[in-house]
């Protein structure tokens, strides 16, 4: 779902205002199961604005936030036994004050970022198109889905990156009734990822040196200052296994497994394969949902390993690869327990969702030895109250808080004093200073909906998040949207 365009439908109109269905949200990655996500259809079109601003960067590579506006449409339709869904959106905005990062989709391609010491704001445009279809008989269910996300990121002052991203997701799934209304399902998914990048300098006084980062403050020294045209090429395979009641009530079990691999290739060095990485990920979900309450246990884990290719002397402009070194590892696990209690009062609805989580993350670089360990506990509480007022109006009020409390943290940076450039060491220390300390987030939501007639409605929604970090650092996120519902 597009997070910038809030669905903003009154709980009297839409079941997703209940928090119960989100307890089993991982199950809906199987398109055969997604036809039971909502009991009724809906469509909306709207425009939104988002401002995400931090007074000083928590992570220098992510900068001080983002400002963007968005227009989009979503639909989820039911006809007899069939279900169709889809969405399309366009986003335009600016990523603010990014440093040591001239690459996009950092969470996808790290640690193999291309960087310089200048950085700055980056303009961005994003496009998304997605759709899916599912159907069922008495004993069988099936579904398919497809989505494509594209992005353009650039800067009009030196250094001048231009990044074009593309992400294609295709999945197909099926399910068989096993007992009562329970269906056992399986789905297969494929993802293709591509990012093409180039950096230009037009200042006649000289150019800034480009670095190819390799993790935890290190960089590939041999190719520093070269390779300003490059691309990332990745593929992901995934499988999902489910046990799900078509009524949406009862025990729900989901296991999602995936493997993603990608290469970083320097185009202007005869497509030299500089780096390779793989990411194995697992997500397990067990939930029990009743009419007015539910409980869920979630476990997620991943292992990411990165490799640096070693090359001999170039012959006729071609570098022969002579070795591959496994130099970077990032391993993480997270457990969470959450529950929902909800109750209706006439046309009003109240729900409360407490949760507690624990996460472990360990990043390692082999030589020089670098290591960051962060273990943290994250309790949270969220509540919503929805009620009618005046004629044909409805209001939703939501509030929540998350508290991130590190219980163990370690950092080791061998040879930091001799590392060049020193800005990369500062980058790692800066990120650790925030990740190893507490932070507290408060969330608020207000939405107003009005029925125009039996077919149409309008919705206005505003969200505000405030996160307080150490060093008098704070983040403010404001999201607003105006939607037409039909």
Over which residues does each language-model region extend?
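N-terminal, post-signal peptide beta-strand-biased segments of exported outer-membrane/organellar beta-barrel
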Residues: 9-96
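Transmembrane beta-strands of outer-membrane beta-barrel proteins
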Residues: 41-47, 82-88, 142-146, 182-188, ...
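Outer-membrane beta-barrel translocator domains and adjoining extracellular loop/strand segments
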Residues: 55-62, 97-103, 154-162, 197-203, ...
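Outer-membrane beta-barrel strand-turn architecture
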Residues: 78-81, 135-139, 176-180, 243-249, ...
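Outer-membrane beta-barrel "beta-signal"
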Residues: 180, 474-486
């Amino acid at each position: 779902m597009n997070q910038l365009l809030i669905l903003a439908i009154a709980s009297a109109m839409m079941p997703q205002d209940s928090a119960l269905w989100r307890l089993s949200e991982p199950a809906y990655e199987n398109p055969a199961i997604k036809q039971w996500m909502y009991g009724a259809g809906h469509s909306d079109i709207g425009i939104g604005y988002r401002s995400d601003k931090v007074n000083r960067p928590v992570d220098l590579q992510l900068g001080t936030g983002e400002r963007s506006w968005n227009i989009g449409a979503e639909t989820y339709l039911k006809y007899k036994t069939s279900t169709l869904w889809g969405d399309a959106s366009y986003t335009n905005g600016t990523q603010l004050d990014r440093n040591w990062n001239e690459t996009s989709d950092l969470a996808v391609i790290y640690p193999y970022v291309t960087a310089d010491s200048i950085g700055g704001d980056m303009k961005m445009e994003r496009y998304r198109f997605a759709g899916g279809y599912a159907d069922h008989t008495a004993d069988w269910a099936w579904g398919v889905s497809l989505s494509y996300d594209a992005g353009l990121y650039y800067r009009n002052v030196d250094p001048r990156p231009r990044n074009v991203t593309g992400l294609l997701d295709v999945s197909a799934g099926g399910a068989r009734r096993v007992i009562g209304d329970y269906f056992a399902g399986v789905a297969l998914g494929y993802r293709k990822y591509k990012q093409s990048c180039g950096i230009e300098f037009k200042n006649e006084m000289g150019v800034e040196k480009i670095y190819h980062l390799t993790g935890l403050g290190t960089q590939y020294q041999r190719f520093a200052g070269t390779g300003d045209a490059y691309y990332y090429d990745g593929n992901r395979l995934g499988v999902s296994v489910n046990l799900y009641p078509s009524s949406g009530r009862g025990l729900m079990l989901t296991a999602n497994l995936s493997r993603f691999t990608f290469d970083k290739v320097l185009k202007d060095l005869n497509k030299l394969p500089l780096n390779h990485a793989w990411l194995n990920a697992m997500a397990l979900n067990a939930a029990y949902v009743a009419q007015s309450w539910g409980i869920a246990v979630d476990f997620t884990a991943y292992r990411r390993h990165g490799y640096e290719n070693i090359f001999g002397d170039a012959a006729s402009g071609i570098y022969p690869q002579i070795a591959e070194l496994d130099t970077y590892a990032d391993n993480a696990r997270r457990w969470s327990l959450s529950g929902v209690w909800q109750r209706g009062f006439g046309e009003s609805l109240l729900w409360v969702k407490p949760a507690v989580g624990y996460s472990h993350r360990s990043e390692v670089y082999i030589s020089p030895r670098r290591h960051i360990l962060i273990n943290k506990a994250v309790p949270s509480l969220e509540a919503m109250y929805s009620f009618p007022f005046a004629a044909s109006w409805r209001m939703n009020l939501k509030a929540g808080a998350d508290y991130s409390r590190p219980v163990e943290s370690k950092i080791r940076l061998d040879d930091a004093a001799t590392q060049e450039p020193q800005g990369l060491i500062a980058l790692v220390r800066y990120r650790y200073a925030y990740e190893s300390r507490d932070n507290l987030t408060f969330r608020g939501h207000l939405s107003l909906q009005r029925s125009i007639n039996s077919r149409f409605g309008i919705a206005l929604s505003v969200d505000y998040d405030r996160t307080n970090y150490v060093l008098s650092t704070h983040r403010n996120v404001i999201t607003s949207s105006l939607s037409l519902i039909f």
